């Protein structure tokens, strides 16, 4: 009888552990997340110090994180006011980025894939974005075409924005990064 209780308890513990781990991975939760405004990053993703849940998520999704010497990657699922990004709304991504050799801003699905659109524009890079005289930029994320830097949403039902900074001086380990260090995401009109 004691052996049966032990086995049932062990099986219940394994099942509960599996359910909790699956839930953490599905919700993309992590324990080493750094945040600057709406942007969330995992500065330890490309290092030996990565937390086990982030490591499992990367193995599960076949994601290729940037190494610590390569740069940092950030994802925004909310605007700067904290509201979730909605595909029926226009957003203005504006400001600048910290000193970096190269950066990219990409529209991705909730699972991290590029979102197809008729314009075949999936993102912007620091080499091609049109900037203001002070070096800042404005990118409009919207379903319908806009003049200037326009990033089309396509037929996406949900999306996120990914900002990658390559060869950057930004270091979450030694520096407190404020919300103004990365671009702001402001909601415009909604359909």
Where are these regions (language model features)?
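A compositional/structural signature for long, glycine/proline-rich flexible linkers
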Residues: 1-191
